[in-house]
């Protein structure tokens, strides 16, 4: 963390300006009531090749399309203009063949241009390749020898050249047997000025020459270029200064900002790239080993080619360099279920299992084993710090459960020390026999995190631990803002408090090149010469740097929410990947009088809906399907109907209290989460915003009619099925402050973390019970913003960043005023 120290006098002035605001609430912390320990593994990072996080990001390679493989398509795919169409495969859950389209480049040779098209031409060829694994090479034919010809690469939106720094060029060139010219390597500014020049000495005409040389630019250019004047198989340019000075290494500033998060582990390689759009373009770790020039790369799930430069060995080495454990995510023979969702034949499961076992052996196997020996050949005979294997990524359903059990049994038998993670969420573990950890994911709006800090409080213990592998506030926050960061800080407080259950967490996605945003909100932004953390980055850093040894109990974990009224809104039906029918729909008011309905009138339809003789039918597997009824707005009514599930994974949705545009309200998600749980979720921006209140175990049988009834009053709703109360819900305002407290045994400090998400300062009285003595002088670390809409930028990269100060007003009981829109950590010496 870049710490900014404030003199005590400045802090005293800040506090005295709020002296008239008396605390309305008291936080009582009892150090004798020890809570859950907080695992040293709690905070890690998750790397996936998305947003050019690797190529053009963490990976230090400066040349785009260095091996000329960018136009290679996955098997069975085809392109039409700038659209790539995947292979038609059968989704293993729905049985449907999904349509899909992904971006594709129309550049004839991506990343490369000729300075003059009249004097030369270029084309891709596979004639006599240097490496069969990366067979494409670029053939440049010079038609007019009197004109200098430059083959130019502009890198990933520019090549960052720094004056007097050294750059390592490697190129593999095969001149024609009758070529009499010379080849010169140039580093150019954005305007074309030559900043460095070096001859490339060809030693063998008609053969491949693998050549390396160093170059130093005479000036700095953030958007420089590399040029070769003159067949080319490979061109690579690396800064000499990489992270830990490793060849084929990582961009130093990007790796250092990741190291600044103090990650306990690194999850790799994904993410959806693990599965691929379909299995044809899944990430294949074995192809990421060895000479970078021989690596084929792969068209990524996220719409561009991944070079495999930041490969398996490089990831493991990075973990060792930053003292983090490694997590490998394997493919179980399933394509991405949010995309094509194909499954390998059962006969191929052994292939995918063997591939996973080989990956483990490469990381930690003895040098006498096949893959341990290959690791040693790469200069690392000692085992790498692999500790976790996640079996699949975001997979679900019976087919996944079957394959998970196969993998779990085989891996545990050979490597019992490894921690194995399933893709299941909080809704249940399906049909699997056993898992060490589950991995729920959340990409949500701020209200979800604010409203769900207690989501783990009553979750069953003893069967497995929890790894929250992907989470972020990324809805209704633009590219990210302070409100998103504060909601994440609040959610983190709940995860820390439940440290006996939640052992690991990682924000996602991690990195974004500003020139290619594939995902709305990301933790760290970069371009060719700059890297910066969003406000959320500093929340993650502060949480990791101030992790207590264990929690201590307090009288409250949030400020008191207030009971609210449901909106006088519309109601409707829906489903998620499920075919469902509704009939005998009846609506009555608070006085018991019937209310006329015309189900033909709908203000919103999503999915395949039909209405025939009072039977409302949804026949698609849309996620979600919606049918919002027009003609009624209210918050005091009884809705009765019959419902039947006809097929699919889940139950049904019952919307109510929806706004005029149907974008805000509530929904009963009945038998959701793989037909295992019923809960009420908020609706914000037309999307479910997460569970609001309790959840109960509940499922529906296929092909069975149920009598359903929803009773709504302004401050309460109840759902009945076949006359039995399933769930009740009361709307509440979103809490504005959140608290967590713990003790650091190494320093003898109480750690108090407070989120204030409102626009006013928040005065709080803090009382420390169960202590003999408290030192008056301690430390305050605070992250705050003038507005919750604020965010860091390339122009103001430290606009929202932690400020650390000394504070001399601590005691067994003390008042502290927390700034508006702030995340504050108090460290108080106590024993």
For the regions a language model picked out, list residue spans one by one.
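Extracellular carbohydrate-recognition regions
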Residues: 27-118, 245-270, 553-613
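Catalytic cores of secreted or luminal carbohydrate-active enzymes
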Residues: 492, 498, 506, 521-561, ...
């Amino acid at each position: 963390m870049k710490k900014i120290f404030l003199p005590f006098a400045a802090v005293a002035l800040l506090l005295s300006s709020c002296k008239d605001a008396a605390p309305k609430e008291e936080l009582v912390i009892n150090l004798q009531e020890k809570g859950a320990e907080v695992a040293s593994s709690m905070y890690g990072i998750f790397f996936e090749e998305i947003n050019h996080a690797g190529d053009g990001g963490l990976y230090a390679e400066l040349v785009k399309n260095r091996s000329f493989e960018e136009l290679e398509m996955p098997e069975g795919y085809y392109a039409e203009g700038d659209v790539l169409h995947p292979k038609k495969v059968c989704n293993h859950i729905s049985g449907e063949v999904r349509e899909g389209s992904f971006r594709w480049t129309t550049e004839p040779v991506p990343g490369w241009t000729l300075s003059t098209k009249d004097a030369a031409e270029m084309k891709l060829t596979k004639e006599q390749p240097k490496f069969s694994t990366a067979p494409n090479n670029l053939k440049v034919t010079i038609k007019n020898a009197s004109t200098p010809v430059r083959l130019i690469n502009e890198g990933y939106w520019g090549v960052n050249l720094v004056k007097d720094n050294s750059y390592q060029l490697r190129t593999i060139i095969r001149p024609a047997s009758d070529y009499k010219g010379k080849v010169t390597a140039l580093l150019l500014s954005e305007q074309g000025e030559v900043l460095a020049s070096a001859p490339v000495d060809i030693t063998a005409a008609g053969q491949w020459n693998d050549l390396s040389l160093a170059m130093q630019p005479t000036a700095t250019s953030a958007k420089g270029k590399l040029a070769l004047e003159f067949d080319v198989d490979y061109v690579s340019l690396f800064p000499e200064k990489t992270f830990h000075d490793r060849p084929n290494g990582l961009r130093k500033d990007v790796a250092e900002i990741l190291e600044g998060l103090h990650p306990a582990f690194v999850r790799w390689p994904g993410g959806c790239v693990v599965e691929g759009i379909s299995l044809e373009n899944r990430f294949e770790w074995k192809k990421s080993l060895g000479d970078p020039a021989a690596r084929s790369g792969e068209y990524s799930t996220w719409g561009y080619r991944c070079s495999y430069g930041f490969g398996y060995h490089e990831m493991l080495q990075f973990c060792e360099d930053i003292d983090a454990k490694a997590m490998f995510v394997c493919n179980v023979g399933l394509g991405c279920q949010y995309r094509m969702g194909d499954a390998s034949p059962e006969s191929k499961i052994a292939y995918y299992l063997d591939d996973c076992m080989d990956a483990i052996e490469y990381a930690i196997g003895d040098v006498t084993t096949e893959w341990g020996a290959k690791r040693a050949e790469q200069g690392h005979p000692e085992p790498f710090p692999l500790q976790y294997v996640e079996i699949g990524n975001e997979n679900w359903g019976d087919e996944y459960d079957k394959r998970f059990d196969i993998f779990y049994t085989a891996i545990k038998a050979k490597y019992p020390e490894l921690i194995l993670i399933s893709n299941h969420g909080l809704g249940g573990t399906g049909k699997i026999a056993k898992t060490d950890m589950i991995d729920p994911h959340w990409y949500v709006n701020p209200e979800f995190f604010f409203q769900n800090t207690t989501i783990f409080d009553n979750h069953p213990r003893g069967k497995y631990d929890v790894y929250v592998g992907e989470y972020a506030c990324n809805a209704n926050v633009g590219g990210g803002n302070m409100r998103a960061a504060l909601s994440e800080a609040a959610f983190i407080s709940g995860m820390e408090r439940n440290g006996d259950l939640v052992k690991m967490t990682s924000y996602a996605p991690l990195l974004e090149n500003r020139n290619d945003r594939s995902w709305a909100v990301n933790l760290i932004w970069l371009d060719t010469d700059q890297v910066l953390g969003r406000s959320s980055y500093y929340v993650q850093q502060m949480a990791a740097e101030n992790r207590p040894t264990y929690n201590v109990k307090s009288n409250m974990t949030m400020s008191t929410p207030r009971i609210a009224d449901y909106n006088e809104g519309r109601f409707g039906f829906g489903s998620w990947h499920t075919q469902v029918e509704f009939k005998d729909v009846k609506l009555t008011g608070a006085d018991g009088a019937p209310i006329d309905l015309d189900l033909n009138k709908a203000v919103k339809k999503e999915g395949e809906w039909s209405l025939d003789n009072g039977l409302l039918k949804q026949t698609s597997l849309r996620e979600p399907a919606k049918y919002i009824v027009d003609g009624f707005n209210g918050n005091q009514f009884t809705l009765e109907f019959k419902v039947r599930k006809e097929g699919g994974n889940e139950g049904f949705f019952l919307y109510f209290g929806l706004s005029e545009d149907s974008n805000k309200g509530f929904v009963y998600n009945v038998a959701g989460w793989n037909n295992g749980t019923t809960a009420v979720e908020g609706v914000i921006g037309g999307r479910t915003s997460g569970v609001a209140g309790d959840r109960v175990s509940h499922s529906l049988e296929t092909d069975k009619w149920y009598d359903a009834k929803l009773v709504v009053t302004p401050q309460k709703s109840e759902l009945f099925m076949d006359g039995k109360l399933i769930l009740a819900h009361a709307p509440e305002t979103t809490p504005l402050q959140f608290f967590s407290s713990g003790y650091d045994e190494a320093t003898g400090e109480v750690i108090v973390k407070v989120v204030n998400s409102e626009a006013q300062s928040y005065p709080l009285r803090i009382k420390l019970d169960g202590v003999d003595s408290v030192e008056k002088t301690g430390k305050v670390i605070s992250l705050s913003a003038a507005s919750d809409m604020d965010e860091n930028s390339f122009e103001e990269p430290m606009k929202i960043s932690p400020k650390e100060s000394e504070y001399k007003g601590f005691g067994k009981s003390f008042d502290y005023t927390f700034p508006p829109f702030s995340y504050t950590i108090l460290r108080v010496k106590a024993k």
